[in-house]
Amino acid sequence: MQAAPRAGCGAALLLWIVSSCLCRAWTAPSTSQKCDEPLVSGLPHVAFSSSSSISGSYSPGYAKINKRGGAGGWSPSDSDHYQWLQVDFGNRKQISAIATQGRYSSSDWVTQYRMLYSDTGRNWKPYHQDGNIWAFPGNINSDGVVRHELQHPIIARYVRIVPLDWNGEGRIGLRIEVYGCSYWADVINFDGHVVLPYRFRNKKMKTLKDVIALNFKTSESEGVILHGEGQQGDYITLELKKAKLVLSLNLGSNQLGPIYGHTSVMTGSLLDDHHWHSVVIERQGRSINLTLDRSMQHFRTNGEFDYLDLDYEITFGGIPFSGKPSSSSRKNFKGCMESINYNGVNITDLARRKKLEPSNVGNLSFSCVEPYTVPVFFNATSYLEVPGRLNQDLFSVSFQFRTWNPNGLLVFSHFADNLGNVEIDLTESKVGVHINITQTKMSQIDISSGSGLNDGQWHEVRFLAKENFAILTIDGDEASAVRTNSPLQVKTGEKYFFGGFLNQMNNSSHSVLQPSFQGCMQLIQVDDQLVNLYEVAQRKPGSFANVSIDMCAIIDRCVPNHCEHGGKCSQTWDSFKCTCDETGYSGATCHNSIYEPSCEAYKHLGQTSNYYWIDPDGSGPLGPLKVYCNMTEDKVWTIVSHDLQMQTPVVGYNPEKYSVTQLVYSASMDQISAITDSAEYCEQYVSYFCKMSRLLNTPDGSPYTWWVGKANEKHYYWGGSGPGIQKCACGIERNCTDPKYYCNCDADYKQWRKDAGFLSYKDHLPVSQVVVGDTDRQGSEAKLSVGPLRCQGDRNYWNAASFPNPSSYLHFSTFQGETSADISFYFKTLTPWGVFLENMGKEDFIKLELKSATEVSFSFDVGNGPVEIVVRSPTPLNDDQWHRVTAERNVKQASLQVDRLPQQIRKAPTEGHTRLELYSQLFVGGAGGQQGFLGCIRSLRMNGVTLDLEERAKVTSGFISGCSGHCTSYGTNCENGGKCLERYHGYSCDCSNTAYDGTFCNKDVGAFFEEGMWLRYNFQAPATNARDSSSRVDNAPDQQNSHPDLAQEEIRFSFSTTKAPCILLYISSFTTDFLAVLVKPTGSLQIRYNLGGTREPYNIDVDHRNMANGQPHSVNITRHEKTIFLKLDHYPSVSYHLPSSSDTLFNSPKSLFLGKVIETGKIDQEIHKYNTPGFTGCLSRVQFNQIAPLKAALRQTNASAHVHIQGELVESNCGASPLTLSPMSSATDPWHLDHLDSASADFPYNPGQGQAIRNGVNRNSAIIGGVIAVVIFTILCTLVFLIRYMFRHKGTYHTNEAKGAESAESADAAIMNNDPNFTETIDESKKEWLI
C-alpha cells in the first residue's frame, strides 16, 4: 500500500542501478570482456562424436577449422539427412558465433545446415531466428570459411550440426569452429515440494522499485515460480499456467472504494520444453517491464498506488502452506532455476551457502535433474514404425502429443489375420478412433473424445480394445472416457505406425482418413511396453522417415503476436492467421486502419456532415475514435464531445477543498492530442456564470479558479484571453463590468454575471478539468459550461513539398519498420521516372519508385534476396494529376496499390529472415546518384506518422514548401458551375456565380414564400438600398443603362407548391418583351415567351402531370435564338421553336420577379390573371444566366444591392437533399452509418480509458434528455391544439410559433427574429400543419 512519503527515493534509485548490474553479472560475462573466444580448436578428439564416419581418418575429431589432420575433416559414411556432427565443450558455454569449412582440398562441403544445442546431450533444441528453426547458409568451396554471428547468444554444453544440403558433386564434408566464452551460474533443483523463502530483515519490505531476475527450465506446464504478499493486500506472483508465464501484481486496492489494483499479464508459450528461459521483472512504481527470453512487454498496473508492501518473505518455487485457499490450489514449481536475483540479492548463492532455510517437505539440490522422457518430432513427411506383439487379443496403445494442427494421423495398425485395422487420428481438434472390421457385417466402429486438443499443450491418449469392447481416454480423465461394446474381434498386428502411414511401403491398399501428423510425441507405449526410441533411432528394431528423435521443435507462431491492434492469432503448423473482426483494422496482420485519418479526408471522399470514426495515427497504436465532422464551411470542423452538461452548477466547495469538475471525453487524451497536433486551429468555449463567486481574482490576487489542459498543466487564463495573461475576455477587450477588474465575476456582484469566450491555444487543449473555488460564502453561486473541442484543418493531409530537380532530396531519420511497415503518399509529376523514397541497411533496403509512365515499383530485401512488386496502370501516371500510393510489408506478405487499381500481393516465405534492418537515413526524392523524383509529394505517412515535408523543405536549399495545381485533380469536385481556387493547403470552390452554397457548391439555397410575398431582382442596382422591406416600388432606371439585349438565356430553379394558379418566375423588360413561368389552375406548367414580332406570346404547355402536388420539381429552360430546350425533373429534354416571325433578342431586360409580379406599365392579361393571390410554397436553386437572385437575397454578396423583398424571406431547402459527390458503395465504405442512427452508432472498440461516450454524452445525460424531450413534446402538443382553436378561421400556412409572432410578418420570421438559438433552416420535407 502507498502510505509513506517519498523519502529514500535516492536510495531506491541506487538499489535499482546496483541490482540491475548484479542480476546480469551472475549470468553473463563482463561487458568489458568480448565473448568471442574460439571454443572448438583446443578440444580433444573425445569431445567430438558423429552419426557415422567413412573411416578413422574421416572421424569427427578432425573437424576443426583450418586444420588438415586425418583426411582434412569429417565425412559420414552416408550423405543423407540423418547425419550429424556433435561437440562437447565439457561445461556450459555462452555461444555467440559459428563458422564452417569444407573438408580440406576436396569436393566435400556443406551448403546449408542446422545447429542444435543442449545441456545434457539429450532433449535437443534447434537454434531459432526470426521465429523459425534457422537454416544457416554454408560453404561454396572446401577451404573458404563462412562465419555467422548469432542473432542472440545461446547457453549450451553440447552443439550438434545437422547438414541439410551439400555439394552435389561431392559428399558431406565439414570443419567447424564455435565462438563464445565461459558461463557459470548457481543452479537449484526444485522437486515440486520444497519452497525456498527469502525472509526480510525487518519483517517488511516496502519498495518503489524492484528488479527480479532468474532463469528456469521445467517440463511441467503449471507451477508457482515466486510469490510474495503483504497483510494490506499487496502481492506479486510469477507462475506458469498452461506453459505460459503469468505475472500477477497488486500494489493496493481500496475495499471501500473503486480502486482495484489487481493486474495480470501473460507472456510466452511452450515453456514446459525443459530448456532454459530467462525472466527479468523491472518495476518502477506502476510502470512494469516484463522480459522473457529477450522479448520485453511493457505495461502499467491498475489502481493508484506505487509502492509494493510485502510482509515477512518472498518465496521461490511455490507458496508456503498458510491455510489460505490460494496456497493450496496452486502447484509448486518442479524444475530448475539459476541466477535468482531479488533487488541485488543473489538468492541462489545464499541457498548454496545454506544461508536460507527451505520450507515444506522436499529435497533442495544444486544440480539439475533431467527428465526421462524422449520426445520425437514429426513433420509433414514423417512416420515412425515400432514393432508390436503379434496375435494378442488385447490392443493397447498410449502416448502424449502436442500440435497446432486440428487434423492429423496419430496411430495406424493392421490387425492380424486380415481382421481389419485401427486408425487413431486428430479430427477437428478431437481424437477419433476408427476400427475397420472385415469379418462382420458392421464395417466400422467410430468413437471420439476431447476438444480443442490442437492448443500446443501436451495431451495424453490411451486406447484399449479387446473382444467386443473398446475404451478411449484423454488426459487421464476416466470420467469422460468413451466406451463401446460393439461386436469386435481383436488380434494385434506386428507393426504400429505413428504420425504417418505410407501405403506403397507396406503393401497396403488402405487410405488413411487424415494427413500426416505435424507435432511432437513422447511416452509412446505399445502393448503396455514403453518404446525405446533410441533403439528405433538405430533402426533396431523399427524404422522411421524424416523424424527427429530426442527433440521437440514445435514453434508457437503467435508468440510474439504479430497480429496488431487486438487482432486474434490462430495458427497451424507452418503459418498463422490474424482475425481482425471488431478491431477497426484490416490486413494480414490487422495493421491497416479501415477508417480515414481525419474529417478532411472524409470531405474529399464526398461525405457530408455526420458522425464518423477517424484514426489520426492510421496504423499507429492509438486506435480509432468517433467524432462529429461539420462540413458546412470551407474548412472542416472536427468536434470531440465530453460529458459535462451546459451550465452545470458548481457544488462541493469548502475552504479546505476546491470543487473539481472532471470532463470525460469520448476519446483518450492521446487520441485527442493526435487531433490537435495535426489541426491548423483548435478552440473550446468556456463560460462561468457567477453570483458572488470570483473567478481569477484579478488584478493581483491568486486565482480561485483554474483549468487543466494537455499534459495535466494548470492554466490561469479564461476564454477570450491567452496563455500567461491572467485575464478574461472582457479584460482583453477592456469592457468589464467594473474596469478595476479583468473579469466580470471578479467584481463580486450579487447579480448574475458571466465570463465566457474561446480558448484557442491548441497546445493547451483540451480542457480536462476545471477547479473552482469561492462558492462557500452565503449567497455565492456559480455555473460552469465547457463546450466540445473543435478543431479545424488537417496539416497532415496537405503537407507537401515540391522537388524542383532530379538531384534534390529530403532526408529524415531511419525508418523503423522491422516486422511491420506501411507507407502511403500522394504524388504528381510530368516525368516518367523517379525514386520516391529509399532507405538502406547493411544488406537490407526498402525503395519505392516510378519506373515508367505506367509503372510503380515497391522493392525491398530483408535478407532473403531482393523482392519487387510492380503495379501497372492502363493510363499514364505522369499526367500532373494526384495519384495515391500505398505499400505495406509484414511477416506475412507485402503489397502495393496505386489509386484504385488492383492491389498486388507477394507472400512472404514460410522460413527465412523477417526483420527489416535499416541503418541509413531515409531519403525522399532519391539519393545515391539514382534518378531522383521531379514533381510533388504530399501526405507522406510511414507507420502512421506523417513526415513533415513542408518544414524539411523550408530548411533545405533548393526546395519549395507545399505544392500547387490541386485543381487539376480535384477541380471536378466543385459542382454546379463552381470554380476551383488554388490554396496553399489544398483548394476551395468559389460558388459566387452559382445558385448553390457549401464546400463543393452542392447545397441548395432556397426560401419559403408565404402568400403575397415576392422578390424582385433589378438587373441594375439603384442608388438606394434595394433590400428595404417596405412595399415601395422604385421607378425604373434609365433605359439607356439597362441590361444588354439577350440572344440566349438559361433559367434553372426548383419549386414545390400545393396552390394553383401562381407565378413562379417573371422577367420583365423596358420594352414589351417578357418571359414567364407559371402554374395553371390545373396544376400544369406553362412557359410564356414574348420577344416581339408576334401578336400573341408563345406558350409552352406541359400538361402531362400536376406540378402543384407539394413535391419538389426542377425546371431548366435554355434558349438559343429561336430554339428552346425544356428539361423537367428527370424527364428527357424537349426542344421547341419560336415562330418564324418572332424576334431572336430579349430586349432590355429590366427585373426578375419571384412569387408575384409587381411591375408598372402594361402586363400580359394571362399573367395578371394568375398574379393574385401569389405564389405560396418554396423556391430554390434559382439562377438566370450568372445571376442567383435568392442567393443574393439570403447571402451577403456583391449582388445583394440589386434585391428588393416584400415580406420575410425564410431560408429552406424545399425538401430536396443537398447534392453530394458520388458516394462510395456501402459494401466498400467502412464508415457507412446510414443503416444506423448516426448519432448513436457505436463501434465495438474501447479506445482506452473506459467506454467511449456516445457522442460525448453519458447515459445519465441521455436519460435526463429523454425526460425533458417528453415534457417538451407534451407542451408542444397542447400548444398545437390551442393554436388550431385560435386560428381556426385564418387558413394560412404556419410553422412553429415563437415569441413575438404578433409583430412579425410570419411565424417563420418570428422564429428568426426572436429566438437566438434558432440555427436550422425550415425543411419542407418535414410534415406540414395546415391550421
UniProtKB/Swiss-Prot annotation:
Write out the tissue specificity statement of the associated record. Answer: Predominantly expressed in nervous system.
Looking at the record, the residues that make up the EGF-like domain are 554-591, 963-1002
Question: What are the recorded GO MF terms, alphabetically?
Answer: enzyme binding; protease binding; transmembrane transporter binding
Q: Which Pfam families match?
A: F5_F8_type_C, Laminin_G_2
**Which UniProt keywords are present, listed alphabetically?**
Autism, Autism spectrum disorder, Cell adhesion, Cell junction, Cell projection, Chromosomal rearrangement, Disulfide bond, EGF-like domain, Epilepsy, Glycoprotein, Intellectual disability, Membrane, Phosphoprotein, Repeat, Signal, Transmembrane, Transmembrane helix
Paired cysteines (S-S) = C35-C181, C336-C368, C520-C552, C558-C569, C563-C578, C580-C590, C936-C963, C967-C980, C974-C989, C991-C1001, C1178-C1214
**Glycan attachment points:** N289, N346, N363, N379, N436, N506, N507, N546, N630, N735, N1116, N1198
Compartments, record wording: Membrane; Cell projection, Axon; Cell junction, Paranodal septate junction
**Which residue ranges traverse the bilayer?**
1263-1283
Q: Where is this region: Disordered?
A: 1026-1045
GO BP field: adult behavior; brain development; cell adhesion; cell population proliferation; cerebral cortex development; clustering of voltage-gated potassium channels; learning; limbic system development
Regions of this protein lying in the Extracellular compartment = 28-1262
Ranges in the Cytoplasmic compartment?
1284-1331
Q: Which domain of life is it from?
A: Eukaryota
* Positions of the F5/8 type C domain: 35-181
Q: Where is the signal peptide?
A: 1-27
Phosphoserine, modified sites: S1303, S1306
Q: Which Gene3D superfamilies match?
A: 2.60.120.1000, 2.60.120.200, Galactose-binding domain-like (2.60.120.260), Laminin (2.10.25.10)
> Which proteins does it associate with, and in what oligomeric form?
Interacts (via C-terminus) with KCNA2. Interacts with GPR37.
User: Record's family?
Assistant: Belongs to the neurexin family.
The job of this chain, per UniProt, is described as: Required for gap junction formation. Required, with CNTNAP1, for radial and longitudinal organization of myelinated axons. Plays a role in the formation of functional distinct domains critical for saltatory conduction of nerve impulses in myelinated nerve fibers. Demarcates the juxtaparanodal region of the axo-glial junction.
Q: Which disorder is recorded?
A: Autism 15: A complex multifactorial, pervasive developmental disorder characterized by impairments in reciprocal social interaction and communication, restricted and stereotyped patterns of interests and activities, and the presence of developmental abnormalities by 3 years of age. Most individuals with autism also manifest moderate intellectual disability.
Question: What is the protein name given in its UniProt record?
Answer: Contactin-associated protein-like 2
Tell me the organism: Homo sapiens
Taxon lineage: Eukaryota, Metazoa, Chordata, Craniata, Vertebrata
